[in-house]
Regions:
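Short, conserved "switch-loop" micro-motifs in signal-transduction and mechanochemical regulators
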Residues: 85-86
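Two-component/phosphorelay signaling modules centered on CheY-like receiver
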Residues: 12-30
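C-terminal output helix
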Residues: 107-116
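Receiver (REC) domain active-site loop signature in two-component systems and cognate sites
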Residues: 56
Length: 121
């Protein structure tokens, strides 16, 4: 049985590329914002890993990370953050707040796959 990954990113192209590439080895659910992701999770869906962009409308990825880590039902789900920002300060802050990893966009699909495998396989 394939492990489940929830991908949250407001850019449909990122969702499509990652879903196609990761879909060979994982069951990927793509949602375009954290609000929809929270609704999906509250329906009883439990992914093995979440990949979330940081800069999104409605709710930012860092807010989503804090929400997830404060929630007893979801805090054990590993979260990998995606961002085009190369800020070391932001990266350190997110890792301290519970992110499992931080990957810069544009990302190499093979690198993403290797990092995911290290976390959930």
């Amino acid at each position: 049985m394939k492990k489940k990954i929830l991908l949250v990113d407001d850019k449909a192209t990122i969702g499509k590329v990652a879903s196609i590439y990761l879909g060979k080895d994982y069951d990927v659910m793509y949602l375009e914002n954290p609000i929809k992701a929270i609704d999906w999770l509250n329906e009883g869906n439990v992914p093995d890993l979440i990949i979330s962009d940081i800069r999104m409308p409605l709710m930012r990825g860092d807010e989503f990370l804090r929400f997830m880590k404060a929630n007893e039902l979801f805090k054990s789900i590993p979260i990998v953050m995606l961002s085009s920002e190369e800020s070391t300060t932001e990266r350190i802050k997110l890792l301290e707040e519970g992110a499992e990893d931080y990957i810069l966009k544009p990302f190499n699909p093979l690198e993403l796959k290797i990092r995911i495998k290290k976390i959930i396989d």
